[in-house]
């Protein structure tokens, strides 16, 4: 199970991020499953090492344009590229009418069979090897989160042990591999479980966007190997998240923590956090890691292979986690989301988290000019601050004694 992010921006594309789409490559089947298909997804596929001829299933979360406007172009291109295998598309109730209208008014004829499935909470697809389930999330329109679960694989069969005991090669080995008990002609019986290692747990991936924090996302993501969750807003803009029914970075982290997932990828970032703006996606990462340390930032064309051992893939470079000295326990951080509020006037707040503060926050709370704030930001990017004495030595113009500085 190999994940490739094709679009990680929300609403509109930016210079470095396209709108939503994630590819799940299944090498053993030579198949690609897509999750959402925002505008220009087929362009992203051309820039990747993925082959459109291997696309077999497309799962649409909801009917907003930044998640579906690339679908029809991709389906048409698959046909022009010579695809003849059936493509199955899954999504909300209005998806079939949308596709039918586009096919009709563009006079598009596909050379392959296109099957559209209307999803409901529960099992969406299963073939014995993989099972896809979905849950209804909490957004302005019906939106579904998807979970792909791989079936458990039998443990290694120790053929040398069977040979040493004189068990004849043939169909009996197949029965032993399945854990069955066999009886030989000489009357000896053998339990197949004695010849096999424990089964290998199947891997799982969960994709949740668009949604505000909700219990169904937590239930869907229970103990998943990878959770891909939207983080449209920073924590300081939680009021916007609640108003627009999107998630903050901390909401995504809370879902990951409650669900006890192995690894969280943040995606679906607002364009307001693009390079050059006061708040960066790295600030959202720091917010999330304070709650759930095993958090990574998704970026276009980032590739991640889910390992079979349930551990975080060694190929992923470690990310610096912000110091969380102010957090005694995980439970202390996971307060009820309904009770969270955003300070109306941030400059009156008594504390500043120096390793996560934005330039505007530093200007307001520290009473410094933009040049000094940028200098602190630049030094922080190179090496995070660890003590108050270091700040007092580097920036004596700030009255640090009047502030409650958190690291």
UniProtKB/Swiss-Prot annotation:
Active site: 66
Reactions catalysed: Endonucleolytic cleavage of RNA, removing extra 3' nucleotides from tRNA precursor, generating 3' termini of tRNAs. A 3'-hydroxy group is left at the tRNA terminus and a 5'-phosphoryl group is left at the trailer molecule
Binding site for Zn(2+) 1: 62, 64, 139, 210
Keywords attached to this entry: Endonuclease, Hydrolase, Metal-binding, Nuclease, tRNA processing, Zinc
GO molecular function annotations of the record: 3'-tRNA processing endoribonuclease activity; zinc ion binding
Chain positions recorded as Zn(2+) 2 binding sites: 66-67, 210, 268
Entry note: cofactor: Binds 2 Zn(2+) ions.
Chain segments carrying region Unknown: 309-407
EC number assigned by the record: 3.1.26.11
Cofactor(s) the protein requires to work: Zn(2+)
Known partners and oligomeric status: Homodimer.
Family named by the database record: Belongs to the RNase Z family.
Stated name of the protein: Ribonuclease Z
Species this protein is from: Thermosynechococcus vestitus (strain NIES-2133 / IAM M-273 / BP-1)
Lineage: Bacteria, Bacillati, Cyanobacteriota, Cyanophyceae, Acaryochloridales
């Amino acid at each position: 199970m190999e994940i490739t992010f094709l679009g990680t921006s929300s609403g509109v594309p930016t210079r470095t991020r396209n709108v939503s789409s994630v590819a799940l490559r299944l090498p053993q089947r030579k198949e690609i499953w897509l999750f959402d298909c925002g505008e220009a997804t087929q362009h992203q596929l051309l820039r990747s090492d993925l082959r459109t001829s291997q696309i077999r299933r497309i799962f649409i979360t909801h009917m907003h344009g930044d998640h579906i406007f690339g679908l029809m172009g991709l389906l048409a291109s698959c046909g022009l590229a010579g695809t003849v295998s059936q493509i199955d598309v899954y999504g909300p109730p209005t998806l079939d009418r949308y596709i039918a209208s586009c096919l009709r008014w563009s006079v598009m004829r596909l050379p392959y069979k296109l099957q559209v499935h209307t999803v409901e909470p529960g099992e969406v697809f299963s073939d014995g090897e993989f099972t896809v389930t979905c849950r209804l999330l909490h957004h302005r329109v019906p939106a579904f989160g998807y979970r792909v679960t791989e079936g458990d694989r039998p443990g290694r069969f120790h053929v040398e042990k069977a040979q040493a005991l004189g068990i004849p090669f043939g169909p009996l080995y197949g029965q032993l591999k399945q854990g069955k008990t066999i009886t030989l002609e000489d009357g000896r019986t053998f339990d197949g479980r004695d010849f096999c290692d424990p089964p290998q747990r199947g891997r799982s991936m969960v994709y949740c966007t668009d949604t505000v924090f909700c219990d169904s996302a937590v239930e869907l993501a229970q103990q998943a190997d990878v959770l891909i969750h939207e983080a449209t807003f920073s924590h300081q803009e939680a009021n916007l998240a609640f108003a627009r029914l999107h998630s903050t970075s901390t909401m995504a982290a809370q879902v990951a923590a409650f669900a006890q997932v192995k690894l969280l990828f943040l995606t679906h970032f607002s364009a307001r956090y693009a390079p050059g703006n006061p708040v960066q996606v790295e600030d959202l990462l720091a917010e999330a890691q304070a709650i759930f340390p095993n958090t990574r930032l998704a970026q276009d064309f980032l590739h991640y292979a889910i390992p079979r051992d349930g551990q975080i893939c060694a190929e992923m470079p470690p990310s610096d986690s912000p110091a969380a000295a102010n957090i005694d326990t995980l439970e202390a951080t996971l307060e009820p989301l309904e009770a969270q509020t955003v300070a109306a006037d941030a400059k009156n707040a008594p504390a500043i988290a120096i390793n996560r503060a934005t330039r505007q926050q530093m200007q307001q709370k520290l009473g410094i000019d933009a040049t000094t704030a940028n200098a602190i930001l630049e030094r922080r990017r190179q090496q995070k601050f660890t003590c108050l004495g270091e700040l007092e030595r580097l920036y004596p113009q700030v009255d640090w004694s009047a502030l409650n500085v958190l690291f």
